[in-house]
Amino acid sequence: MLFVIVVALSYLLYRSLTDPYKAVIAEQEMTENVRHRMELVRDALVLYNSRTGDYPPTENGLTALVEWVKTDSLIATQADSLFAFLPPDTFNADQLIVSPRTGASFTYTLNDTLRPNVYLLEDPDSEDQIGDLRRTTMLNAPNWN
C-alpha cells in the first residue's frame, strides 16, 4: 500500500515539474512561429514594393497582398519556396496574413505621408511588430531583435 502511495506521489511530483516546462516550451515555439509568419509578410511586402513601386494601401492592404502573391506570375510560381511556413504547416497564400497563435489576421497600416513610405505590421495577440509609422529607420525592422 505504501509503495502505491509513493509511486502516485512521485508521478504527481514529476507532472508538477514537467507540465509547466512543456507549456513554456510550447509558448516559445508558438512565438517563434508567429514571428516567422510576420517575417514572411514583411518579405512579401518588400517584394510587392520592389515589383510595383509602392506598398499596398492601409484599407484591405493585406488582402491585396495575398491576391498579389497568388496572381503575380513570378511570385506565384515560387511562393511555396519564398514563403515557406515552419513545419508542420505548409504554405497557403490565404494563411500568410494570419497569426498561427489564434487565427486572427495581422494588422497593417501604411503611412504614405513620409518618404519613403513606411508601414506598421502588428500581431494582434502580442506586442510584436515590424516597422514603424514615424521613423523611416525602422522600415522592415522587427521590434523583437
Model-derived features with residue positions:
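Hydrophobic membrane-insertion alpha-helices, especially the h-region
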Residues: 1-18
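Short linear motifs at secondary-structure transitions and domain/linker junctions
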Residues: 15, 30-32, 93-98
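Short amphipathic alpha-helical segments, especially helix-boundary/capping motifs
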Residues: 15-22, 38-41
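Aliphatic-rich helix starts adjacent to a transmembrane/signal segment
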Residues: 19-34
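N-terminal alpha-helical signal peptides/signal-anchor transmembrane segments
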Residues: 31-52
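Low-complexity, acidic interaction segments enriched in glycine
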Residues: 47-145
